[in-house]
Amino acid sequence: MEKKYTLEDFAAIIKQLRGENGCPWDKVQTHESLREAMLEEAYETVEAIDKKDIQNLKEELGDVLLQVVFHADIEEEKGNFDLSDIIDGISKKMIYRHPHIFGTEKADTPKEVLENWEALKKREKKQSTQTEAMKSVADALPALLKAKKVQKKAKEVGFDFETVWQALEKVHEELLELEQSLCQTKQQQEEELGDLLFAVVNVSRFLKLNPEFSLTKAIKKFINRFECVEQSALMGGKSLSDMTLEELEEFWQNAKHSKNPTEE
């Protein structure tokens, strides 16, 4: 029977790769050099989930695990912590933040569990104010996702719109201010554009939609329609760069109103 490797085996493989007689590339990697790879593997895992590609999900989760073990080995070499410390830490965190399972607290609904989780998280991180909780949201997060998390922190203390219509009204207000900034400085335009995006995220939160996913779908839809435009042009013996804006717009409208299964 073919050997089935364990987590301990995998950690030993990484250790050998980074050892004295190991791989020249693996030996010189740092947290900073692996930063982009960590992000890429996380996004590729999410893509596998979105596509419901279970076989690829298994592979991508392995790639994420590679990053975890790699970073752990870097710190073990420095004498700071190792993989067992990471596992010990996350195990203790899960027990601490689930007192309704491992303790005597009561939480019967997912909402109550999340409320307890956030309260315990603030206590654990010694966050005495809601502002500190907001500032703790990672800067490395995609901006739309970070905006949503910050808005949820504000909601926890009651600082929020009452209805989605109020949130939409804010979008209209910010759009008007952006229009007015067009004759002002780039700095003012940037500020107003940021305010508009922040307001749009608020609407997505009320609709219980992920703004990142919504934008990703919009990008995919744009590419699909652009492909239809280009194919129509090629079938007519034309090049996009040689067409007028009016011609392109006509093709675009045709693509927009045609049934495209890839946009469903």
Please annotate each region the language model reported:
Residues 1-60, 66-193, 197-264:
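Flexible "arm" and connector segments at domain edges
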